């Protein structure tokens, strides 16, 4: 299933390019696609499904794109949630499509970022989709560790973890900062091999400038829940 989902991701990104849609892989499949050493050496873990993202303004093209690629739509789900998420089923398995915004425990606006790479989100965005998980599991930890093991920490755009960009995400978002730094602590605790970069990112987020909304929310702290749980998202 792992290799078939990898193939499906490449097929869908290619079909998207042909139709002018910047469809990009994320999740475990996207992480593996962005980590060439791990992808070449294997073995790959089994993936349950494929997550992809498309720009908000491409939402109307998505059903036709997937139909052309041989997928069946989850019509009920898509009718109810299609403005932000869609689900399709094909020979390789289930594909979950995020429209513009990645919305799980926290919201990440992906639309302006989808044109930066050809097949996946950037390493920085892939990492943040893992760091925003509150109830982090071992797969999330391992995915984050894989990204940290194959990408340097730098400032500015490029094929690395962009500390400046990550800092902008938490500038006015205390909740995302709280979750991301907490998850980095879990990664550092469970994976000695990437503890140093995990702690370095946490330190960068801690020391980065913060906006007024961040400071106001920080006063409330953990007395009020700062995240959503995916199954509670309407």
Regions found by a protein language model. Name each.
Residues 63, 67-106:
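Conserved catalytic core of two-metal-ion nucleotidyltransferases
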Residues 2, 52, 56, 87:
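Short gly/ser-rich anion-binding loops that grip negatively charged ligand groups
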Residues 28-32:
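Short glycine-enriched loops at secondary-structure junctions
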Residues 37-62, 66, 144:
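Catalytic metal-binding acidic patch
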Residues 34, 56, 129:
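Active-site-proximal flexible loops/turns
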Residues 1, 60-70, 114-116:
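Short N-terminal helix-initiation segments at or just after the protein's N-terminus
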Residues 1-25, 37-46, 99, 103, ...:
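The feature captures the alpha-helical scaffold/lid subdomain characteristic of nucleotidyltransferase
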């Amino acid at each position: 299933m792992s290799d078939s989902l990898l193939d499906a991701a490449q097929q869908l990104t290619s079909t998207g390019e042909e139709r002018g849609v910047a469809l990009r892989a994320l999740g475990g499949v996207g992480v593996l696609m962005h980590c060439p050493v791990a992808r070449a050496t294997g073995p790959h873990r089994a993936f349950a499904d494929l997550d992809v993202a498309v720009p908000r303004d491409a939402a109307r093209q998505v059903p036709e794109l997937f139909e052309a690629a041989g997928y069946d739509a989850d019509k009920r789900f898509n009718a109810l949630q299609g403005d932000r998420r869609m689900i399709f089923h094909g020979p390789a398995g289930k594909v979950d499509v995020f429209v513009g915004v990645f919305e799980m425990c926290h919201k990440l606006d992906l639309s302006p970022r989808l044109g930066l790479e050809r097949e996946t989100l950037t390493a920085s965005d892939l990492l943040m989709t893992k760091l925003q998980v509150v109830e982090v599991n071992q797969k999330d930890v391992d995915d984050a560790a894989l990204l940290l093991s194959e990408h340097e920490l730098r400032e500015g755009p490029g094929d690395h973890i962009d500390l400046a960009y990550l800092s902008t995400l938490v500038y006015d978002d205390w909740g995302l900062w709280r979750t991301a730094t907490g998850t980095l602590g879990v990664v550092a605790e469970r994976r000695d091999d990437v503890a140093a970069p995990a702690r370095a990112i946490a330190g960068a987020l801690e020391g980065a400038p913060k906006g007024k909304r961040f400071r106001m929310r920080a006063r409330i702290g953990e007395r009020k829940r700062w995240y959503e749980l995916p199954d509670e998202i309407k």
